[in-house]
Amino acid sequence: MLIIETTLILRREIKRLKQEGKRIALVPTMGNLHQGHLKLIEEARIHADVVIASIFVNPMQFDREADLANYPRTLQEDCELLRDKHVDIVFAPSAKEMYPNGMENQTIVEVPVLSSVLEGASRPGHFRGVTTVVSKLFNLVQPDVALFGEKDYQQLQIIKKMVSDLCFDISIIPVPIVRDKTGLAFSSRNRLLSDNEKQQAPVLYQAMQQIAEQLKSGNLDVNQLLQTAKATLEQQGFRADECFICDAQTLAPLSEESRCAVILMAAWLGNTRLIDSQQVSLV
């Protein structure tokens, strides 16, 4: 397994792989890997000859300095996990390598509308940071396929639109959420939970499941469903942050034409922000 830290060496390797006719899969990550990431790697192996994982804690997508400072950085441990999964290349650049002229002078890639609604409304600039760095990774790696988890559902939809709008010749493969036995979605932030908080954390999934059951039964009173879910979270020690029910394809409010809904939930448990999502068929 090659560990590459510079764009110069990465481009050299990509050129060689392309000349050899290799099919390339990219799995972009911010490190601190868990079972969800490893599922992405396993799926990538099915779709390509060469699997490349990037590890980069992207400062452009953080809207709080404290979050950036506290984000776990576990490069050595991550590389051991990726080696065990037979990843071919790990691209682990520094911020200086990715933004040599500084972020304030960086050309921006931003998907309109989708980036400013739902979670984007309360985190201005977050998705712009995501799409900017992902577009840079796409240009550097030139993958045939790229894999993203469905837990960050709005991010997934934004990246799909960016790929379509900018004519990237890349197939985006969504990978279902990986959960532990309690239903809690694997997340890099789970490590930040105390022992007591880990016992409370599955309530987020349970609240989402309650909404899903109501939607399946035909209850489309979105406001009532969200109020009930938020009350459940607050009673269990959470601070509800972002809770939405919308059309899974457009991220617009549900309508009579909606065939599939998506539940998007984010809540604080102590000092840790947890997110989750679930799609629900309405037909």
Swiss-Prot record:
Pathway: Cofactor biosynthesis; (R)-pantothenate biosynthesis; (R)-pantothenate from (R)-pantoate and beta-alanine: step 1/1. The keyword Amino-acid biosynthesis does not apply. One of its GO terms (biological process) is pantothenate biosynthetic process. One of its GO terms (cellular component) is cytosol. It is an enzyme of class 6 (ligase). Signal peptide: none annotated. Pfam families: Pantoate_ligase. Beta-alanine binds at Q61. It comes from the Bacteria. It catalyses: (R)-pantoate + beta-alanine + ATP = (R)-pantothenate + AMP + diphosphate + H(+). The keyword Lipid biosynthesis does not apply. The active site is at H37 (proton donor). ATP binds at residues 30-37, 149-152, 178, 186-189. SUPFAM superfamilies: Nucleotidylyl transferase. Keywords: ATP-binding, Cytoplasm, Ligase, Nucleotide-binding, Pantothenate biosynthesis. It is found in: Cytoplasm. GO terms for molecular function: ATP binding; pantoate-beta-alanine ligase activity. Homodimer. Catalyzes the condensation of pantoate with beta-alanine in an ATP-dependent reaction via a pantoyl-adenylate intermediate. This is Pantothenate synthetase. The gene is panC.
